[in-house]
A protein has these predicted regions:
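Outer-membrane beta-barrel biogenesis signature
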Residues: 18-70, 74-76
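Short loop/turn motifs that connect adjacent beta-strands in outer-membrane beta-barrel proteins
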Residues: 20-26, 38-40, 56-64, 107, ...
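Extracellular loop and loop/strand-boundary signature of outer-membrane beta-barrel proteins
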Residues: 55, 82-86, 121-128, 175-180, ...
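Residues on the lipid-exposed face of transmembrane beta-strands in outer-membrane beta-barrel proteins
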Residues: 56-58, 69, 98-102, 112, ...
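Residues that define the transmembrane beta-barrel architecture of outer-membrane proteins
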Residues: 63, 90-96, 130-136, 152, ...
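Transmembrane beta-barrel strands of outer-membrane/channel proteins
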Residues: 67-75, 112-116, 156-162, 205-209, ...
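Outer membrane beta-barrel transmembrane domains
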Residues: 78-80, 86, 219-318
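Outer-membrane pore/translocation modules
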Residues: 119, 126-222
């Protein structure tokens, strides 16, 4: 992908006015309820390549300011080597990360994460495992627009990925060069998030673009574009708790990797996932989970096939 165009989604809807007789709105609970869909975040907790990049899309968090722990698992099928046609090798990418979002001003927040990676691929010669600290990420999130009389909100983000995780040059010789703890490079992210909310329903539209630079080994992973549309529906609530379900689509597009400035063949690709999940909050504690299954996958020119993704997080409001 040689060029990228950020897409600004804009949806117009008439405002909905609530009265005291409206059973959806309870004055004591209203402040907590209006934050339900507030924190659809931009984040790619990534290694950063055609598969195994660790992108979980955009998180929806019940607490607008929090610290927490998240587990994220991915499963791929890959060719054993470049000389066979069958996808027989199972690859598992696992991430356990600390993350948080802290407000700086009314409109500006800082979002960050530090992952611990433990990956495995099952080869004909035996299992290969790697583990260790991954690349840290920091992003500033700014509320660009929030209408007073409707439920429209637009936010933007600028972020950087810090190369803390180990990059092993030997790992790029296999079918999947992203079997790494980190990219070894400073990478930069641009993001947009649009929210429409009406009563107990919300729709989130998100897009982000990651610019990946060349590392010290003169290897450069391809730039990455993520996009997602997620619908949320409040299934149950009382004065202290909310339980919501979510359903959506998430897509990812990857440019070619490069080494010594030359394009590496069979490294670009794309995938589209359907996702289903839930989120529950009790006072300042929130728990969420999500399952993602591919509806389309063409990673590394077909040498890698996405199988599934699963995530689970526990957050504590500040």
């Amino acid at each position: 992908m040689k060029q990228f165009i950020l897409i600004l989604f804009f949806i117009i809807s008439s405002p909905v006015l609530a009265t005291k007789k409206d059973s959806i709105y309870i004055p004591k609970y209203e402040t907590q309820y209006t934050t339900l869909f507030k924190s659809e975040e931009f984040f790619c907790d990534a290694c950063g390549c055609a598969a195994g990049n660790g992108s979980s899309g955009f998180e929806s968090l019940l607490n607008p300011q929090f610290i927490g722990i998240k587990y994220f698992a991915q499963h791929y099928k890959a060719k054993e080597n470049l000389f066979v046609n069958d996808l027989t090798q199972d690859q598992y990418y696992n991430t356990l990360q600390l993350w948080g979002k802290i407000p700086v001003t009314k409109k500006l927040s800082i979002y960050g994460s530090l992952p611990f990676q433990f990956h495995e691929k099952k080869t004909q010669q035996g299992d290969i495992k790697i583990s260790g600290i991954g690349d840290a990420s920091v992003m500033g999130i700014y509320e660009i627009l929030k209408s007073k009389n409707t439920f429209h909100q637009l936010s933007g983000g600028l972020g950087v990925k810090i190369p803390i995780g180990k990059f092993d040059e030997k790992g790029i010789t296999g079918v999947n060069p992203s079997f790494q703890l980190g990219t070894g490079s400073w990478d930069y992210q641009l993001a947009l998030s649009y929210k429409f909310q009406k009563n107990i329903f919300a729709l989130m539209l998100n897009t982000d673009y990651t610019i990946k630079t060349e590392n010290k080994k003169q290897y450069q992973f391809g730039n990455q574009w993520n996009y997602a549309a997620t619908g949320f529906y409040s299934l149950w609530r009382n004065e202290n708790s909310i339980f919501s379900g979510k359903l959506g689509l998430q897509g990812e597009v990857y440019d070619w990797n490069k080494q010594f400035g030359e394009i590496m063949p069979r490294t670009a690709g794309s995938a589209l996932y359907g996702k289903l999940g839930f989120e529950v909050s009790y006072k300042k504690i929130s728990i969420g989970s999500e399952l993602m299954l591919p509806t389309y996958t063409n990673l590394a020119s077909g040498d890698i096939e996405a199988k599934s993704r699963f995530s689970l997080f526990v957050n504590f409001g500040l």
